[in-house]
């Protein structure tokens, strides 16, 4: 799925978010400008807050998982391990799935 950053609509709708995959995030990172690479994180963050406010916890968990993946694999900012750990733990608090547990183990190995 092609990811677009839209300042007029700075979050993903639930159906769009659920259509995103970790590969989509990696492809976006490879093709985007440095600014848009960072902006994607903030769009995901805004989406997470919006979903939690609407009590859409399974989708919020998926968003937190995508954030952990993006921080740990693609973006790798300073403290990426700690930040990714925070978001994968949040995903697991909201919806404990085998996929999130597997990623927790990967993240816990460090980068």
Located regions from the model:
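Generic alpha-helix detector with strongest preference for long hydrophobic helices that associate
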Residues: 25, 48-49, 56, 81, ...
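Helix-turn-helix repeat elements of alpha-solenoid scaffolds
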Residues: 32-47, 77-83
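A short acidic, glycine/proline-enriched capping/turn motif at secondary-structure boundaries
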Residues: 70, 75-77, 93
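Long, ordered, amphipathic alpha-helical scaffolds
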Residues: 2-3
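TPR/TPR-like (Sel1-like) alpha-helical repeat modules
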Residues: 81-96, 105
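Flexible helix-coil transition and linker loops at the boundaries of alpha-helical arrays
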Residues: 45-60, 91-100
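Amphipathic alpha-helical repeat scaffolds of TPR domains
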Residues: 6-35, 56-73, 98-110
């Amino acid at each position: 799925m092609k990811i677009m950053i839209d300042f007029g609509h700075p979050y993903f709708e639930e159906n769009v978010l659920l259509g995103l995959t970790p590969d989509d995030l990696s492809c976006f990172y490879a093709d985007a400008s440095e600014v848009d690479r960072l902006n994607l994180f903030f769009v995901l963050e805004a989406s997470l807050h919006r979903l939690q406010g609407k009590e859409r916890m399974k989708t919020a968990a998926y968003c937190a998982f995508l954030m952990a993946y993006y921080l740990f694999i693609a973006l790798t900012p300073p403290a990426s391990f700690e930040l990714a750990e925070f978001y994968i733990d949040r995903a697991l608090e909201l919806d404990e799935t085998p996929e999130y547990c597997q990623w927790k183990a990967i993240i816990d190995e460090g980068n």
